[in-house]
Structures are given as structure tokens and as C-alpha cells.
From Swiss-Prot:
Keywords: Cell inner membrane, Cell membrane, Membrane, Sugar transport, Transmembrane, Transmembrane helix, Transport. GO terms for biological process: D-ribose transmembrane transport. The lineage of its organism: Bacteria, Pseudomonadati, Pseudomonadota, Gammaproteobacteria, Enterobacterales. This is Ribose import permease protein RbsC. GO terms for molecular function: D-ribose transmembrane transporter activity. GO terms for cellular component: ATP-binding cassette (ABC) transporter complex; ATP-binding cassette (ABC) transporter complex, substrate-binding subunit-containing; membrane; plasma membrane. Part of the ABC transporter complex RbsABC involved in ribose import. Probably responsible for the translocation of the substrate across the membrane. (Microbial infection) Probably transports the toxic C-terminal region of CdiA from D.dadantii strain 3937 across the inner membrane to the cytoplasm, where CdiA has a toxic effect. Toxin transport is strain-specific, mutations in this gene do not confer resistance to several other tested CdiA toxins. It is a multi-pass membrane protein. Residues 44-56, 146-168, 241-294 are periplasmic. The complex is composed of an ATP-binding protein (RbsA), two transmembrane proteins (RbsC) and a solute-binding protein (RbsB). It is found in: Cell inner membrane. CDD domains: TM_PBP1_transp_AraH_like (cd06579). Disulfide bonds: none annotated.
């Protein structure tokens, strides 16, 4: 065996390990927490983790699309709160639950499109544009709800709406089914459609993408609209699970979504990343939160641990770049 062959294999092994670092981290985390807590690796707890992770994971899909285009969206948490409140209020006046879901999804997509227009047409930096939208939407939510929770009520229609949060088709929680469908759809779009190729191209080199004749502004608007749609879907699930919409819901959720994307290996510079990695990143956060809770770790220390994990992920990403 030649020195060149050995060197090539070592390089391949190192590259493979770097590519699978998120999955390896998840498996190591599961092994450690399972050893420390006998109640961790049980069917009920695993379903509980997946159900709690679903909201962040769905939001993280939309965030992945935005970050792949070299953008960011800080407004998703506020958008979740607003669309969730709208859905709850519609269900509360006994309008069909499916109408409430459709209205919330349409509102989320429309607001996301507005954000996209500001970024693409207005040429405002994504950080600034979405920071403004975050504050604006939070204020609108407070005005709409008068700062009070919006309950869905206890009617048959409310029970139908609640299925999106606490239903268990075939014994699996509805949010887990929805999360799986969203990830499969996003994976297919990114790897088997023209839009997916354009998203990667835009994040890789916007100037070259524009010169090749692709409507860059249209792609940005679509991506932010999809991000808004998925944020509203996450809001529907959360409200359906709790039977009420809190005006402060979603606070800090944008950071969790970004963390899941970064932990999954998507580059903050855009153009590089995998939707499967985002799912793994969301699961890492979900398992980490659940494990620390089972071990009785204070919520204050949990924030510190999460911050360290995210920082390490960013440092690894920078080294890879």
C-alpha cells in the first residue's frame, strides 16, 4: 500500500467524520445521558422529546432555507406568537378549525413575503429587516391580544384543532408526523427541484447567480415566505397543544432555530448545509434540554451549557471553512 493511498484514506476518514460530526455528537449525547439517567431512554420519554422538539425543528427548516441564501430571520418567534393568537381567536369564535389553520398559515406566508420584499427589493440587510419585523410583530401581537392569553375554548371544534398538538395517529404524536413530513418535503425541494438548486447557488455566490439570469429577488421572497409559513405552522402546533395562545409565546425561539441550523452543520455564510443536519441539530437541543431536566440541572446552568455547545459548533464551522 502506497503512502499516497494511506494519506488519501486518512483524508477521506477525516472528511467523513467532519461531515457526520452532528450525528456523532447526538449519539454520544444519548449514550451519556442514558447512562446517567435510567428514565431517559424510554419510549414515552423519546416521544415526549420528539413532540417538544417538533416546534423548534419545523421553525429550523425555514431558518435553514433562509441561512442557505446567506440571510437570517429573527422575526420567526414573534410571527409564531401572532399567527398562533390569530388561529386561537378564530377557533374561539367557533369557526371551523381547518379555516383557522389555513388563515394562520396564509398570514405567516404573507408576512414572510413582506420581509422578503424588504430584504430583496429594499436592499435592507436581513439582520436589520428581520429585527424590525420581530419588534413590530411582537407589538402587533400585544395589541391584538391586549396582552392576555387567547383560549381556544372547549368545543368540539376546539378538540379538532387540538388534534394538531396532542393527537396520536397510529400511536405517534401528530407534531412528530408533521415534523417528519416537513423535513421530507424540504429535503426533496432542496435536492430535486430547480428552486433548491437556486437556493444553494444564491448562497454560494449571489452575483454569479444574478448574472446567470436567475431572479434572485424572487428566490429571496419565496424563501422568507416559506420561513414565515413554517413559523406559523409551529405556532399552530404549540397553541393546539396548550389550548391557548400566549402573547409572549415564541420569545427566544429564533435563537433556538438558528442554533439547530448551526449545530446541523449549515454554514452561516450560506450556500452549504443539509436539511438532515438541521433535524439532527434540533434533536441535539431537544435531547440536551430533556437530559439536563432529568438530571435536575438548573435552568440557569442549562442556558450556559447550550451557549457553550453552540459556540463550539460555530468554531468547528469556521475551522471547516
Amino acid at each position: 500500500m502506497t503512502t499516497q493511498t494511506v494519506s488519501g484514506r486518512r483524508y477521506f476518514t477525516k472528511a467523513w467524520l467532519m461531515e457526520q460530526k452532528s450525528l456523532i455528537a447526538l449519539l454520544v449525547l444519548i449514550a451519556i445521558v442514558s447512562t446517567l439517567s435510567p428514565n431517559f431512554f424510554t419510549i414515552n420519554n423519546l416521544f415526549n422529546i420528539l413532540q417538544q422538539t417538533s416546534v423548534n425543528a419545523i421553525m429550523a427548516v425555514g431558518m435553514t432555507l433562509v441561512i442557505l441564501t446567506s440571510g437570517i430571520d429573527l422575526s420567526v418567534g414573534s410571527l409564531l406568537a401572532l399567527t398562533g393568537a390569530v388561529a386561537a381567536s378564530i377557533v374561539g369564535i367557533e369557526v371551523n378549525a381547518l379555516v383557522a389553520v389555513a388563515a394562520a398559515l396564509a398570514l405567516g406566508a404573507a408576512i414572510g413575503a413582506v420581509t422578503g420584499v424588504i430584504v430583496a427589493k429594499g436592499r435592507v440587510q436581513a439582520f436589520i429587516a428581520t429585527l424590525v419585523m420581530m419588534l413590530l410583530l411582537r407589538g402587533v401581537t400585544m395589541v391584538y391580544t391586549n396582552g392576555s392569553p387567547v383560549n381556544t375554548g372547549f368545543t368540539e371544534n376546539a378538540d379538532l384543532f387540538g388534534w394538531f398538538g396532542i393527537g396520536r395517529p397510529l400511536g405517534v404524536p401528530t407534531p412528530v408526523w408533521i415534523m417528519g413530513i416537513v423535513f421530507l418535503a424540504a429535503w426533496y425541494m432542496l435536492h430535486h427541484t430547480r428552486l433548491g438548486r437556486y437556493i444553494y447557488a444564491l448562497g454560494g455566490n449571489e452575483a454569479a447567480t444574478r448574472l446567470s439570469g436567475i431572479n434572485v429577488n424572487k428566490i429571496k421572497i419565496i424563501v422568507y415566505s416559506l420561513c414565515g409559513l413554517l413559523a406559523s405552522l409551529a405556532g399552530i402546533i404549540e397553541v393546539a397543544r396548550l389550548s391557548s395562545a400566549q402573547p409572549t409565546a415564541g420569545t427566544g425561539y429564533e435563537l433556538d432555530a438558528i442554533a439547530a441550523v448551526v449545530l446541523g452543520g449549515t454554514s452561516l455564510a450560506g450556500g452549504k448545509g443539509r436539511i438532515v443536519g438541521t433535524l439532527i441539530g434540533a434533536l441535539i437541543l431537544g435531547f440536551l434540554n430533556n437530559g439536563l431536566n432529568l438530571l435536575g440541572v438548573s435552568s440557569y446552568y442549562q442556558m450556559i451549557v447550550k451557549a457553550v455547545v453552540i459556540l463550539l459548533a460555530v468554531l468547528v464551522d469556521n475551522k471547516k471553512q
